[in-house]
């Protein structure tokens, strides 16, 4: 990274911190009406948490820039044993025509010894037509009579009948490219060799997460006819943020397109069944046992993202409530098994879902002043501009620079704002301890 860019990144944080210190010590209306004071404190808290999430991204970019930019996929060392791998295609009630595409794509995956690739359709619906599909493509079929634990139960049932040292998880709609295995398994074979040579200074890899990629337009691209103008809304996390997480050894598991070391999944008790986001919680458990996780940047599979509002609401509700629920299950603030870096990543993920409530506060603050003359910042306009503007604009310039061409910040904020009403109630409801199983 060029030195001038590093200076701008650091300066953005310094100016932003100066502004926040001014806000806390000089701009809170302590003698105002109780309602005004409470809202002013909520606004300051929102600004602090928003800045924290930005600082994490910028600092990770500063200290890990070279590592993420030079992330290279190792090649198979044919002098080393090629491990067996189970490829589990998870299905519940998806159409067979959709599942057929994924199964067909899986049969064309490259591997040095294809006899060591075991493709399995794990169908908790026990459907005869899916069984016939497995026979047609000469892959294995696993089913169960009654599944009480949704996707996690389906995968756990399949794992009980499999024994390869590695396994991959694919959703029913997620078609793997031919290089899916050759872009993920070599990380493990290289790690196995390093563990043999230097076990005291090498951490084992628990899983490798490849990006979530979609061949259809997302709900925003589709309805606003912006397929060629903006990228898919999930690209920024999958191909940027999670790669940064992985550069620190703590990539998040996002539910599909990942390859796992079987022994650590068994060690943590399989896929968690007491959460609606078993993916997020499983990845956290694996990291808490001292195993690292890696995220790659280039897509090696492609699936379908929902484009109707009903499906999007259900999806985001499940994500929001599930992450909050899993963070509570894992005690991310106090769990001694979670390292400092991993804790920062998890807290940052937790705070992301609370960003919807922060946006509501940001919208309300100027409206309160415009309509009711409620002043929640104890400062005149020009002092506010002098202290706030330099840090704000430089910070947002830096955030835009760190996102490269994967993310447009303005579109990102617009998308989040449109989902505010969907997620806000769910967050408060689930933070109180309530659960919602039928979102699976």
Where are these regions (language model features)?
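Catalytic donor-sugar/metal-binding loop of nucleotide-sugar-dependent glycosyltransferases
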Residues: 274, 284-301
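A conserved acidic beta->alpha catalytic loop
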Residues: 122-130
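Short, acidic, metal-binding catalytic loop of nucleotide-sugar glycosyltransferases
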Residues: 102-116, 191
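N-terminal membrane-anchoring/stem segments of glycan-assembly enzymes
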Residues: 1-79, 134, 356-359
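Short aromatic/hydrophobic "clamp" motif used to bind/position activated sugar donors
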Residues: 167
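Cell-envelope/extracellular polymer assembly enzymes that use nucleotide-activated donors
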Residues: 83-86, 118, 281
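Membrane-embedded multi-pass helical conduit in multi-pass membrane proteins
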Residues: 18-47, 352-437
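Long helical/loop segments within the catalytic core of UDP-sugar-dependent glycosyltransferases
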Residues: 145-160, 164, 178-276, 287-288, ...
């Amino acid at each position: 990274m060029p030195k001038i860019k590093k200076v701008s990144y650091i300066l953005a944080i310094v100016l932003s911190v100066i502004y926040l210190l001014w806000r806390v010590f000089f701009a809170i209306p302590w003698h105002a009406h109780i309602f005004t004071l409470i809202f002013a404190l909520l606004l300051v808290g929102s600004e602090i948490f928003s800045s924290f999430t930005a600082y994490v991204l910028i600092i990770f970019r500063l200290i890990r820039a070279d590592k993420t930019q030079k992330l290279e996929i190792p090649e198979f060392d044919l002098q080393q044993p090629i491990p067996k791998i189970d490829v589990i295609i998870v299905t519940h009630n998806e159409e067979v025509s959709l599942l057929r595409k994924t199964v067909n794509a899986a049969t064309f995956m490259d591997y040095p010894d294809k006899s060591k690739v075991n493709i399995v359709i794990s169908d908790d619906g026990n459907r005869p037509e899916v069984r016939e599909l497995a026979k047609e493509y000469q892959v294995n079929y696993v089913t169960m009579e009654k599944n009480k634990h949704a996707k996690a139960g389906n995968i756990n049932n399949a794992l009980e009948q499999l024994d390869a040292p590695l396994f991959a998880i694919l959703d029913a709609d997620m078609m793997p490219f031919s290089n899916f295995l050759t872009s993920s398994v070599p990380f493990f074979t290289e790690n196995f060799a390093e563990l043999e040579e230097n076990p005291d200074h090498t951490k084992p890899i628990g899983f490798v997460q490849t990006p979530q990629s979609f061949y259809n337009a997302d709900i925003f691209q589709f309805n606003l006819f912006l397929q060629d103008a903006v990228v898919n809304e999930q690209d920024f996390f999958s191909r940027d943020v999670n790669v940064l997480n992985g550069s620190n050894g703590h990539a998040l598991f996002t539910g599909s397109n990942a390859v796992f070391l079987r022994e650590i999944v068994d060690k943590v008790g399989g896929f968690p069944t007491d959460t609606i986001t078993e993916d997020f919680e499983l990845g956290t458990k694996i990291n808490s046992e001292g195993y690292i996780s890696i995220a790659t940047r280039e897509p090696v599979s492609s699936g379908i993202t929902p484009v109707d509002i009903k499906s999007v609401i259900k999806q985001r509700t499940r994500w929001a409530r599930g992450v909050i629920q899993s963070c509570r299950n894992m005690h991310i603030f106090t769990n001694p098994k979670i390292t400092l870096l991993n804790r920062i990543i998890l807290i940052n993920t937790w705070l992301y879902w609370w960003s919807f409530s922060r946006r509501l506060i940001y919208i309300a603050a100027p409206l309160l002043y415009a309509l009711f003359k409620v002043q929640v910042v104890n400062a005149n306009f020009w002092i506010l501009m002098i202290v706030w503007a330099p840090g704000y604009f430089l910070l947002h310039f830096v955030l835009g620079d760190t996102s490269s061409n994967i993310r447009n910040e303005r579109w990102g904020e617009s998308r989040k704002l449109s989902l505010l009403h969907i997620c806000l109630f769910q967050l408060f409801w689930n933070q109180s301890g309530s659960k919602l199983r039928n979102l699976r």
